[in-house]
Design a protein with these regions (language model features):
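Active-site core of metal-dependent hydrolases
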Residues: 189-293, 311, 316-318, 336, ...
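Acidic/histidine-rich helix-loop elements
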Residues: 82-101, 153-162, 185-193, 275-288
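Histidine-rich, glycine-flanked metal-binding segment
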Residues: 32, 36-72, 93
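Divalent metal-dependent hydrolysis catalytic cores, especially in the metallo-beta-lactamase
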Residues: 103-129, 141-152, 174-187, 212, ...
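Metal-associated gating/positioning segment near the N- to mid-region
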Residues: 69-136, 197, 220-221, 225-228
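Active-site gating/metal-coordination segments in enzymes
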Residues: 149-204, 224
């Protein structure tokens, strides 16, 4: 998305209603998930500036009393299309618009995602301006990792392996956090769409540059992405057991979706119908329903593979921003993943896949103070992830609804 930082700052000005953290903040918790699979009981998290500096049950005075809630690290969505939105006419407006109105929509998508408890997202759209504005404290939004331009098999990208390598270097120089490669088409298309030599050249050059490669791969392209040594396979429809085991053996991360994307198309069929790349009429969306058990089946099979690193990514498009947890719920309810494993996939494992586990993804000393609180216990009822009552990102509180929770105890501060 090509909009200036100024445009994004202007777009988000009305939404900047949050409180800067004081130098030292103490958060009291009765139950906290550390993001790595452990549960902390009856302790206090001490934040100084943007970092967690202590976990001390005797720290005082208490600034935020979150006892009675479930506290955990901010969630991470490893695959979003943050510029995708519905336009003024209510229809799908696609991705990457360069108008002021499109900038407002993108900023609103990001803000809704933050308030839903997601403190870091990985955008498959080019949103470098938004990324920088957020990083410099100008916008209330999740921390953003972004591509600059995807490798999709057009123009300069269809040349020799050397030309593909030059394209990858161009992305690195332009400030890409990672490289997105489209190696296959839609959900029903089985053929690999990029030459294997080009895919291998791209992944190899990116690896030399320290750039991660995320490959959109279904069916034949799953094997191609694995053979090329990519960092992460996205979607993975049609992945065989051999493919899944190969990913585990090679340490390749896997980012399947469990059904929210398909359900979103079905729920919003009237808004997507007749727009580019979608069926012309709402009635023509019904066959998509057949894909729900297929996507859920991929998650079910992947979860049974020892050592396979499954990260949480939703492929969030228009209609999904701010509702990203629905795919997390789907992974547990339909995919059979244990609640703790699902939550870790959206915390420390996602951070590890992004090479940011030394900064985010856990409640640990020295990490960013990305802290959320849920009204309920997601280990007993995964739908509790819908009830985000408190959001802190990098030591700054963006949401505080704990005063409205009937079972919560007294609280000494409010950002509202």
């Amino acid at each position: 998305m090509r909009v200036t930082t100024f445009l994004l700052l202007l777009a988000m000005a009305p939404l900047r209603q949050f409180a800067e953290a004081e130098n030292r903040v103490v958060i009291a918790v009765s139950t906290a998930l550390d993001g790595k699979g452990k549960v902390l009981r009856d302790t206090r998290i001490v934040v100084s500036g943007s970092k967690i500096v202590a976990i001390d049950p005797k720290a005082s005075p208490i600034d935020y009393d979150l006892r009675g809630l479930t506290v955990m690290p901010g969630l991470i969505d490893a695959h979003v299309h943050i510029t995708s939105s519905f336009g003024p006419d209510g229809k799908n407006a696609g991705m990457g618009g360069a108008t002021l109105e499109a900038a407002y929509r993108t900023a609103a998508n990001a803000y809704a995602t933050l308030l839903a408890g997601f403190t870091t997202i990985q955008s498959m759209d080019s949103v470098a301006a938004l990324r920088e504005a957020v990083a410099h404290g100008g916008l209330p939004a999740p921390r953003i990792l972004s591509i600059t331009e995807p490798l999709v098999g057009r123009g300069e990208q269809t040349g020799t392996p050397d030309e593909v390598r030059a394209f990858v270097r161009k992305q690195k120089d332009a400030g890409a956090d990672f490289l997105k490669i489209y190696a296959s088409g839609g959900m029903r298309q089985t053929a690999q769409t990029i030459p294997q030599t080009a895919l291998e050249a791209a992944c190899d050059e990116a690896r030399k540059l320290g750039l991660r490669t995320l490959v959109h791969a279904n069916y034949d392209a799953v094997h191609g992405a694995i053979a090329a040594g990519c960092t992460q396979v996205e979607h993975g429809l049609g992945a065989t057991e051999a493919d899944l085991r190969a990913m585990a053996e090679k340490g390749i991360y896997f980012d399947p979706q469990a059904g929210q994307l398909i359900q979103n198309y079905l729920d919003n069929r009237a808004r997507y119908a007749g727009t580019p790349y979608f069926p012309k009429t709402p009635q023509e969306f019904e066959p998509m329903r057949e894909l729900l058990p297929i996507t859920q089946g991929v998650v079910q099979r992947a979860h049974k593979i020892p050592g396979l690193k499954i990260v949480f990514g939703t492929d969030a498009l228009a209609g999904m921003h701010g509702h990203n947890v629905e795919d997390l719920i789907n992974r547990v309810v339909e995919g059979g993943i244990a609640p703790m494993d699902a939550l870790v996939s959206a915390n420390s494992l996602a951070a590890e896949a992004m090479k940011m586990d030394d900064q985010i993804g856990a409640l640990a000393l020295g990490l960013e103070a990305d802290i959320i609180a849920l009204d309920g216990d997601p280990l007993k009822d995964i739908t509790a992830v819908r009830g985000v009552a408190f959001v802190m990102k990098g030591g700054t509180v963006y949401k505080n609804e704990i005063h409205s929770m009937p079972h919560s105890r007294s609280h000494s501060k409010s950002v509202r």
